[in-house]
Amino acid sequence: MKFFALTTLLAATASALPTSHPVQELEARQLGGGTTRNDLTNGNSASCADVIFIYARGSTETGNLGTLGPSIASKLESAFGRDGVWIQGVGGAYRATLGDNSLPRGTSSAAIREMLGLFQQANTKCPDATLIAGGYSQGAALGAASVEDLDSAIRDKIAGTVLFGYTKNLQNHGRIPNFPADRTKVFCNTGDLVCTGSLIIAAPHLTYGPDARGPAPEFLIEKVRAVRGSA
């Protein structure tokens, strides 16, 4: 897979999109707005949340939650309470640059170390917390690589993971290596070419908003409650 395919298609997407997806909306989803949350890194171990959600945004997205993360966070907070869940985006060494998509694991080694560090910090700071995770596009590859590389003792604390537009979906057979399939939910739209082994960005790759507002957080909530009970 060549990096030029990704950059060329990003430039060409506007002229090729169906009229049902306005160019401005799609550009905003791929390149625009985002929110930053650092509840884990800023939080006090004396007041740990019961649940910690660690999320990796897609390429070029701003903040550390990007475009989809805030919707998931909102639904999680509705379910568990504002103090019952900590929301943590992956920032720091994870730059979410386009070129890193072409690396063997779909992101950089530095980014993987960054997300691993957040899982490790969650385990050290809040050892009784239930962990959940997610990622979009390059962030999905990052989430998968990080979970795969975790020490098994920490990995076993992850109740569920959601991946959108998973760039390593084909290579990893629709799952996360070394992680239970029943704790993984992959969202790959029909026509999203990155889910079939390409780095070509087509319109379906940019339309995961409804999944982030509904099925994805609902899956995570279900998995957390299976571990912690319905309270």
Swiss-Prot record:
Task: Look up keyword Secreted and say if it applies.
Answer: yes
The signal peptide annotation in the UniProt record is 1-16
Name of the protein: Cutinase 2
Function of the molecule: Catalyzes the hydrolysis of complex carboxylic polyesters found in the cell wall of plants. Degrades cutin, a macromolecule that forms the structure of the plant cuticle. Allows pathogenic fungi to penetrate through the cuticular barrier into the host plant during the initial stage of fungal infection.
Q: Gene encoding this chain?
A: CUT2
Q: Which UniProt keywords apply?
A: Disulfide bond, Hydrolase, Secreted, Serine esterase, Signal, Virulence
Stated family: Belongs to the cutinase family.
**Entry annotated with the keyword Acetylation:** no
- Tell me the organism: Fusarium vanettenii (Neocosmospora pisi)
Provide the organism lineage as a comma list: Eukaryota, Fungi, Dikarya, Ascomycota, Pezizomycotina
